[in-house]
Amino acid sequence: MNSIDKRLLDVLERYIASGIEQQVDYEKFYLYSLVTHSTAIEGSTITEVENQLLFDEGIVAKGRSINEQMMNVDLKNAYLYGFEWAQKMQLYTVDFLRQLSAMVMRRTGTKYSVVGGEFDSAQGDLRLCNVSAGVGGSS
């Protein structure tokens, strides 16, 4: 083992001994980051700090729409449900995917009336129409 490896192992050992790892909830940090970045793709402007206040303290972000905040809350709850479901090592089913979809869209979903019929994204209904990316985007 060379000196760099020894120094690296020494630093790692001191880090573990410091207990920092026990002071930071990395799973929670990862979840909040995942939710923040996932909803940003959908247009949310809520920051990780604002989500932390919303999720941990129930403090809403000033100047952010209720729709944005509910999108973040719903996605967090859906992720937690999905993590719990994965621990049980259950099979994927259409019913499970519909339930998960309903959790994601719980407060922000809407009813649609299209050529193929009617469906409600807040209920986890399967889409009866094409999906496009932006105005005029291809399906």
Tell where the protein language model's regions lie, with residue ranges.
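FIC/Doc superfamily catalytic core
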Residues: 1-139
